[in-house]
Swiss-Prot record:
Its EC number is 2.7.4.1. The gene is ppk. This is Polyphosphate kinase. Keywords: ATP-binding, Kinase, Magnesium, Metal-binding, Nucleotide-binding, Phosphoprotein, Transferase. Mg(2+) binds at residues 392, 422. GO terms for biological process: polyphosphate biosynthetic process. The lineage of its organism: Bacteria, Pseudomonadati, Pseudomonadota, Alphaproteobacteria, Hyphomicrobiales.
Amino acid sequence: MDTEQAIEIQEKDPVSSPPAEIASSPERFINRELSWLHFNRRVLEESVNPRHPALERVRFLSISANNLDEFFMVRVAGIRAQVREGIAERSPDGLTPLEQLKVINESVSQLAIDQQAIWRDLRKFLAELGIVLVDGQDVTKSERAWIEDHFLASIFPLLTPLAIDPAHPFPFIPSLGFTVALQLMRTSDGRPMNALIRMPGKIDRFIRFPGSKDGVIRLITLEQATSLFIGRLFPGYTVKGQGAFRIIRDSEIEIEEEAEDLVRLFETALKRRRRGSVIRLEIEANMPEELRAFVQDALSTTDDEVFVVDGVLAMNELSQLTRVDRPDLEFAPYVPRHPERVRDHGGDIFAAIRQKDLIVHHPYESFDVVVQFLQQAARDPDVVAIKQTLYRTSNNSPIVRALAEAAEAGKSVTALVELKARFDEEANIRWARDLERAGVQVVYGFLQLKTHAKLSMVVRREGGGLTTYVHTGTGNYHPVTARIYTDLSYFTSDPVIGRDVTRVFNYITGYAEPIDIEKMAVSPLTLRKRMIEHIHGETSFARQGKPAVIWMKMNSLVDPDIIDALYEASQAGVSIDLIVRGICCLRPGLPGLSENIRVKSVIGRFLEHGRIYCFGMGQGLPSAKAAVYISSADMMPRNLDRRVEVLCPLQNPTVHQQVLEQIMVANLKDTEQSWQLLPDGSSTRMKAAKGEEPFNLHNYFMTNPSLSGRGKSLKESSPRRLTRRNERNPS
């Protein structure tokens, strides 16, 4: 192994077939859904990582729960729909939809049990640290008096007690809705009644008691506080039994082939989604059996859609606990750097780009430079046109404001707003209307393709002609997520890249297929072909006895054709290192198939989101002659075939070196936040080699300047050079 770390790998025999048979059988792939569940388990494992502060561990637990909710809303919902429709088509790994549901349920059941066990331990740990979550029966006399006043003033007006009988049918419960079910008895005549109390979704789940002794913070959940005062909601009734439940609904949106008004179509589809079928019903374990049957029957759920939870529901809301004022239990604040080269030019972003290409590495370097790029364009009298894609952005988005400002200043502004960005559809409809009111030409792209490419283009009058400035990146134009996602922003005034981006926009706005793209590759047209050609190229170098190396960094590796090409390359002797944060359907390390492929996943303080693809071109890696790309695309069929994505080459020597020799090497070198993927799809934590210090790539970039953004500061500070053990060209 030519990486700098020694890795302890558990010996496992994931498949019974010999390698020769695996190479042509479905067993060569790991199931996509199970691979995602393995990823979510890695996230969950960070909640027990002693290196993390306590509240950050709670945050990781919350993230794993939120991830699981979305998995059911989208992936499980889709598989259940296939089962309902009688579709028996097998996944690439050979499972029918029904078989996939079975293995998913088995894996999720254990994951949910582990989440609850971890929460019980974390709750005790927080109490030791002075953050106490109390149950209703444990409140003190003074706390009960305070919570009663608070309940009547701030909670009671928001609650609607719902009796269930022929005159009061079971109400609609929204997805992720948290509800308390009750068995009541009228005290006057003993008459039984079932009832519901829907917990309001717009207020905090955790209520903090005022005052404390010795700095101890005491909190109670909204549902526990409500349970103390059921009599206020149902006077004249006695509670005989109760329990909370929560549902998850199908969140897929079906789009009609023929649509005259795409915005109106999505508004209608969003209303339908709110009433999607229930695909998961979570019920507290202490709910009486009769009451549980009542809820299940009312929601028309089958037994395999019901999950009995021995613990807390809606664990995604545990993230609210991180709002308590205990900075000592969180990561130390980090303030992103501003690229020194932009400062050297007095804040003139266009002058900085004219000097040479620039890579901004988020979140270590501020996303403000991207906002500044558009704000300066909006206010610069020499700028005549701006074109922009928007997939996801933030509330009160400065990107949207800058585009509106530019249009109001009389510039030609075109914005592609992707309405099909899952769970951001409503926000994007709102942004589209705001932009149209400001005079922006808004388009929605293709009905059957999502535009996922991250592109911004500014055309400026310079020296009697026009210069095109381009920003393209791996992440969304979202200032909030840019503080916690690792992504790359690439700025260039390369006229060839400018022409390529112009053609991509023409493709999006006018369906003009960009047949003469010069440097970039675009899906669904040429990106897959470019990737396969590069993989085959390294395979050919290996067969000629030349150095042959591939490094890739992505979120997901699913596409069967890409995986098979990598298998072929491995069999030819190509050295392949893959950094895959999430889903990986490739089996690494199988003799005769993938023994030259190593796969790792980095899970840490920041969410790894950038996509980088590197090919040695017969020189090995790292090498100044390597082909290095950044992209918005993962290696999934949806990115390669059903989305508009771009693959952008990095050819400026400094930018090339920064991405290849600094960013990629740091990712490969990391041992403190990395997991080694095993042939069966599971993973094990990586460890530094004996006698060597653990390496944390996030800490490295928080304390070392980037190569392309240093400017004059190069004289005062250079990044610590990274090397990998046996840094040589493999032959």
